[in-house]
Amino acid sequence: MTLNLCVLTPNRIIWDSEVKEIILSTNSGQIGVLPNHAPIATAVDIGILKIRLQEQWLTMALMGGFARIGNNEITILVNDAEKGSDIDPQEAQQTLEIAEANLSRAEGKRQTIEANLALRRARTRVEAINAISS
């Protein structure tokens, strides 16, 4: 039995295909979803989406949103998303280093919050790449 997974951003469809299982980062932690999962609607955190096809796992960096799960259908609407295989490792590492530097230079509450969010997004992109190679 399979699940139909659809990952959408406001601009495009990132993924629309059948999968065996997913592991999703929510605001209350990670959840695993298998066929016949109980219906749920949840907020999606900045984090990694792991997708199992057959014996192969793929990763995707999600930048926050929400998910609806029910009747073996999973719809994830996020601000932005990238497949781990589409992320340039050098660019992601460079973005992470810039985000770390910006956080150390942040002045005031607003700059600190924005720098922390940028750092979380950058770390998620690097984690999506590293999860592929492990």
Swiss-Prot record:
The record's keywords, sorted A to Z, are: ATP synthesis, CF(1), Chloroplast, Hydrogen ion transport, Ion transport, Membrane, Plastid, Thylakoid, Transport
- One GO-annotated biological process of the protein: proton motive force-driven ATP synthesis
Q: Which CDD domains match?
A: F1-ATPase_delta
Q: How does it sit in the membrane?
A: Peripheral membrane protein
One GO cellular component this record assigns the protein to is: chloroplast thylakoid membrane
**Origin: domain of life:** Eukaryota
Task: Give the Gene3D superfamilies listed for this entry.
Answer: 6.10.140.480, F0F1 ATP synthase delta/epsilon subunit, N-terminal
Q: Where in the cell is it found?
A: Plastid, Chloroplast thylakoid membrane
Q: Which GO terms describe its molecular function?
A: ATP binding; proton-transporting ATP synthase activity, rotational mechanism
Q: Which HAMAP family match?
A: ATP_synth_epsil_bac (MF_00530)
Binding partners and assembly: F-type ATPases have 2 components, CF(1) - the catalytic core - and CF(0) - the membrane proton channel. CF(1) has five subunits: alpha(3), beta(3), gamma(1), delta(1), epsilon(1). CF(0) has three main subunits: a, b and c.
Instruction: Describe the family membership recorded for this protein in Swiss-Prot or TrEMBL.
Output: Belongs to the ATPase epsilon chain family.
Chain's role? Produces ATP from ADP in the presence of a proton gradient across the membrane.
Which NCBIfam families does UniProt cross-reference here?
A: ATP_synt_epsi
Protein name (record): ATP synthase epsilon chain, chloroplastic
Which gene holds the coding sequence for this protein?
Answer: atpE
